[in-house]
Structure formats: structure tokens, C-alpha cells
């Protein structure tokens, strides 16, 4: 009898909503939501501490299920995808020496010139982002990281891992993006890479929506203003603004 009473006294109450939410989540435990795995997110949503559409992997379908569990209206979620802001392939980017050391992006501060490539802003191709991606959505192709748009779940792990901040999350529906992150002046850029942005501002002047600006010699697109007309892509003399 004592054990029965003690069992009731110390029993852990189970939040049925939390259990249902956890079952609805994909279970990747990628941490892209900002919580320690799916269990942490389920608990936060059940307590009202996180929005029902917080899971980037589950996206809108999972968000709708969780909204139903919480008795809320479903919130429309725009899908995102990771994008690498670099075009410096082995063919296009100048290499100053042959690197034979450890291939780890976190070692860049200790590597001469920050890597073999003349451009110190671009992708070194060591692939730390590849190793951290839980969905196999990133691959090193011709010396730079390339994202498989369909496989990417926008968990953001690659964004956090890249020491040069070359990877960003952009709308899945986005039609064009700037594939460069260099802030060097034009002469330095042309000496280091065949396709780097030289900050000429032709894209900025051509955009009919004011979505493109050039800051510190590099073009940037405001995705909220961009309509995907492609005018900037056509105007770019370096071919650094590309379809995504």
C-alpha cells in the first residue's frame, strides 16, 4: 500500500499536448529551432514559449499539425534554403600555393594567408559545413561548398559553422542571389578571382525595385524587395549574380 501511495505522490505529470507535439516533430534533433533537440522544442511549444511553426525541418506541414494540437490557427511559413555566397571554384579563383595540411575550416586562422586561395573572403573548400549537415545537403564541388536546394531543410547548422559567414538562409522561392562575399576593391578582386564582385554598382543602378545595394565593394540583395526580375543578373559584368 505504501508503495502505491508513494508512486502516486512522486508520479511525473505528463503533458499530453507536449507528447503529441513531440510525435508530430520530425525527430532530427538538428537544433535548428534554437532548442536542444525535438524534446526541448516540444516542451517549449506546449508551454507557449515557442511558436507552433518553429521547426525549420518540418516546415508548414508540421506547423499546421502542431497548430491544431495547440488549438491555434496555422501560420503560413515561407520555406528557406541555405545559400553559399562564393563563386571561387578551383578554375575561377587564383591559388597562391598548394595546401597539404588539415582540411578543417576552423584551422583557417592558422593557415598561411587563410588558405591557398588568393581571396581571403571566399570558401576554402575544407568542408566543415558538409560534416555538420544532418541531411547530406552540402557537397564540395570544384573547391567550394554547394547546397542541394531540395535536400536542405534550413536548420542553419552550416550557417553557424562557417567561420567566414559565407552561408546564409534565403527564401526557397528566391530567383537570384549574389555569389560573392569579398570586400576588396575591384583591382584586388580581379587579381584574385575571375568572378568576384568588384562593386561597380551596375546592379544597384539597374534594379527597378531598389532591392540591390553595394556596401563595402560587395553587392547585397534585399530579398523582401526583390521580385526576381533578373535585371541585376543581366547587368552584372562579372556574372556573380546568378539564378539559384
Q: Would you name each region that the model predicts?
A:
Residues 1-206, 210, 233-235, 239-243:
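Ferredoxin-type iron-sulfur electron-transfer modules and their immediate structural context
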Residues 219:
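Glycan-recognition and catalytic cores of secretory/periplasmic carbohydrate-active enzymes
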Amino acid at each position: 500500500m505504501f508503495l502505491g501511495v508513494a508512486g502516486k505522490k512522486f508520479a511525473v505529470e505528463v503533458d499530453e499536448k507536449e507528447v503529441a507535439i513531440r510525435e508530430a516533430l520530425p525527430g532530427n534533433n538538428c537544433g535548428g529551432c534554437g532548442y536542444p533537440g525535438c524534446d526541448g522544442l516540444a516542451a517549449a511549444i506546449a508551454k507557449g514559449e515557442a511558436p507552433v511553426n518553429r521547426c525549420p525541418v518540418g516546415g508548414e506541414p508540421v506547423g499546421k499539425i502542431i497548430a491544431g494540437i495547440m488549438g491555434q490557427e496555422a501560420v503560413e511559413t515561407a520555406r528557406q534554403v541555405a545559400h553559399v555566397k562564393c563563386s571561387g571554384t578551383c578554375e575561377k579563383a587564383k591559388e597562391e600555393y598548394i595546401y597539404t595540411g588539415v582540411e578543417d575550416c576552423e584551422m583557417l586562422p592558422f593557415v598561411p594567408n587563410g588558405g591557398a586561395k588568393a581571396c581571403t573572403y571566399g570558401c576554402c573548400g575544407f568542408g566543415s559545413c558538409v560534416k555538420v549537415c544532418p541531411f547530406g545537403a552540402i557537397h564540395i564541388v570544384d573547391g567550394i561548398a554547394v547546397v542541394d536546394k531540395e535536400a536542405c531543410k534550413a536548420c542553419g547548422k552550416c550557417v553557424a559553422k562557417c567561420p567566414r559567414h559565407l552561408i546564409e538562409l534565403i527564401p526557397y522561392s528566391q530567383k537570384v542571389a549574389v555569389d560573392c562575399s569579398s570586400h576588396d576593391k575591384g583591382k584586388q578582386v580581379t587579381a584574385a578571382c575571375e568572378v568576384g564582385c568588384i562593386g561597380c554598382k551596375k546592379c544597384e543602378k539597374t534594379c527597378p525595385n531598389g532591392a540591390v545595394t553595394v556596401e563595402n565593394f560587395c553587392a547585397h540583395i534585399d530579398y523582401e524587395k526583390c521580385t526576381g526580375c533578373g535585371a541585376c543578373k543581366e547587368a552584372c559584368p562579372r556574372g556573380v549574380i546568378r539564378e539559384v
